[in-house]
């Protein structure tokens, strides 16, 4: 009688443990480089995949010198509209989240940084210069 009772207990314990682990799925992606349309699309698809798989959150490891404003805005909008919490982790050691990366990090549900990483320099940069006011 002790063996069947122990077997039932073991089965229940395994079932409960698998339910706990199934509820704690976490997505992970890495973004390393300039922010552009491909990055915005990649992040948007990853958020949709995390939602479809009922993940607890999506972790984005970020290392970027910045990028395009339009792509940054799309990423921020996808974070703000996401039913899945987004965690931005600036890493590895020595990584940066400057310019567009700063805005992306600050828009996340949770922002975290590895030791010796940097964030900042968040201002628009003109690539083509300003048109002249006339001939001189």
What kind of feature is each model-predicted range?
Residues 1-7:
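Positively charged n-region of N-terminal signal peptides that target proteins for export
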Residues 20-136:
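Soluble extramembrane regions of membrane proteins in the secretory/endomembrane system
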Residues 7-17:
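Bacterial N-terminal signal peptides
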